[in-house]
């Protein structure tokens, strides 16, 4: 059984490969031609399933459903003081207008972080309770499966550290005085929302692996 990841995010690919050792794992571009997936779900779970199902459909078109499963991750940060923003729009936060609609495709890690900082500062806050959510979805010839992982802490109004991506430099996990951007990879791998979700998803993968010839 081989796994193709339903993402073009190289940072996510690296992190997932580090956790799921012992599997033959491929980035999306290594198996199928890149194609656009419209993530129009209202939850992390819905969007994760949209991605894993879309990729598995491509695998079926190529006659690879007996060889591969698809695995996707949909994750994001929710800040209490911002009413749960950016949430499922974490990767597209800069492009999110005041009416909750995504306009344009200009969002990147840097301007997403800058927007979150400006939102906190507008409320005269230096920090707010926040949490990360990760939903891992697996699609296979046997069906679809999901698992969730969470990490709690606080979002702050200044960037600290350069080790990581996304909002890592703005998030201090509970029990630590450093941001994810300041922590080493080994520590992050132990506590991250994605790792917790992958730990549960690994039970599914082990079970599926037994059913592949």
UniProtKB/Swiss-Prot annotation:
Entry binding sites for substrate: 7-12, 75, 165-168, 188, 193-194
InterPro entries: dITP/XTP_pyrophosphatase (IPR020922), ITPase-like_fam (IPR029001), RdgB/HAM1 (IPR002637)
GO cellular component: cytosol
Keyword Metal-binding: yes
Keywords: Hydrolase, Magnesium, Metal-binding, Nucleotide metabolism, Nucleotide-binding
Signal sequence segment: none
Cofactor binding notes: Binds 1 Mg(2+) ion per subunit.
Active site: 74
Entry keyword Magnesium: yes
EC number: 3.6.1.66
Residues that bind Mg(2+): 74
Record's catalysed reaction(s): XTP + H2O = XMP + diphosphate + H(+); dITP + H2O = dIMP + diphosphate + H(+); ITP + H2O = IMP + diphosphate + H(+)
Reported cofactor(s): Mg(2+)
A molecular function GO annotation: nucleotide binding
One GO-annotated biological process of the protein: nucleotide metabolic process
Subunit and partners: Homodimer.
Similarity field: Belongs to the HAM1 NTPase family.
Annotated function: Pyrophosphatase that catalyzes the hydrolysis of nucleoside triphosphates to their monophosphate derivatives, with a high preference for the non-canonical purine nucleotides XTP (xanthosine triphosphate), dITP (deoxyinosine triphosphate) and ITP. Seems to function as a house-cleaning enzyme that removes non-canonical purine nucleotides from the nucleotide pool, thus preventing their incorporation into DNA/RNA and avoiding chromosomal lesions.
Name of protein: dITP/XTP pyrophosphatase
Organism: Campylobacter concisus (strain 13826)
């Amino acid at each position: 059984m081989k796994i193709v990841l339903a993402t073009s995010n190289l940072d996510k690919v690296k992190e997932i490969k580090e956790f799921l050792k012992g599997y033959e794992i491929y980035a999306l571009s290594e198996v199928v031609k890149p194609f656009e997936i419209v993530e129009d779900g209202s939850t992390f779970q819905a969007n994760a399933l949209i991605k894993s199902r879309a990729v598995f459909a491509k695998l079926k078109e190529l006659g690879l459903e007996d060889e591969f499963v698809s695995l996707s991750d949909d994750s994001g940060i929710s800040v209490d003081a911002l009413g749960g923003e950016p949430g499922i729009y974490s990767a597209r936060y800069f492009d999110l207008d005041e009416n909750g609609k995504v306009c344009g495709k200009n969002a990147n890690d840097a301007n997403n972080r800058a927007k979150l900082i400006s939102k906190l500062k507008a409320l005269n806050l230096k920090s707010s309770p926040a949490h990360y959510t990760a939903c891992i979805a697996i699609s296979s010839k046997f069906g679809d499966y999901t698992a969730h992982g969470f990490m709690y802490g606080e979002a702050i109004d200044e960037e600290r550290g350069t080790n990581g991506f996304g909002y890592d430099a703005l998030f201090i996990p509970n029990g630590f005085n450093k941001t994810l951007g300041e922590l080493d990879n080994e520590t992050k791998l132990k506590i991250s929302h994605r790792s917790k979700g992958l730990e549960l998803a690994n039970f599914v993968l082990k079970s599926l692996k037994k059913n592949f010839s």
